[in-house]
Amino acid sequence: MTKIMTSIIAFDLIEKGDLSFDEKFMISENAWRLSQSGYSSMFIMVGDMVSVEDLLRGIIVVSGNDACVALAEGIAGSEEEFAVMMTSKAKEIGMDNTNFSNSSGINDPDNYSTVRDILIMSNYLIKNYPEFYEMYKEKEFTWDRTGGDPITQGNSCLLYTSPSPRDIR
């Protein structure tokens, strides 16, 4: 659920012209650390310059926690400030029982929501960003690592066993 709002914040900024898919963010040690933690990861490296588009695909396709932190830091300067933006957006769209404490959803008791609020958020994404919603149907993507070979990553979830997949996370 947290990664949905992380994506929505980026989509809002792209739509307003304040952010572009081509903009690149330098990967911090903080973001990189999550790629080494055993959590879902895009496997970004400290110092990599990664585009917003690739970070979004890393979040949407492979559920990359490191990509969430990199995007949050690139947009807001810190994950904490980004979480404030997320909670503010949640209230703006009618999510009355939700609070965000980080951009990835990694365990934190201050990161919570309700089924109703998650439905509101999911409907907001589908209604307001149908062109970006298509990313949620992708099975894999390839991105160019700074100074390294391109990396192809995929999503191996059961989503693709259904004839009409619908997945948001």
Outline where the language-model segments fall.
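Active-site-adjacent loops and short helices of periplasmic peptidoglycan-processing enzymes
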Residues: 1-119, 126-127
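Residue-level detector of alpha-helical segments with a strong bias toward transmembrane helices
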Residues: 13, 144-147, 164
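Residues that scaffold the ATP/ADP-binding catalytic core of kinase and kinase-like folds
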Residues: 70, 135, 168
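Conserved active-site loop region of the serine DD-peptidase/beta-lactamase
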Residues: 128-159
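Single conserved hydrophobic/aromatic residue that forms the stacking wall/gate
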Residues: 160-169
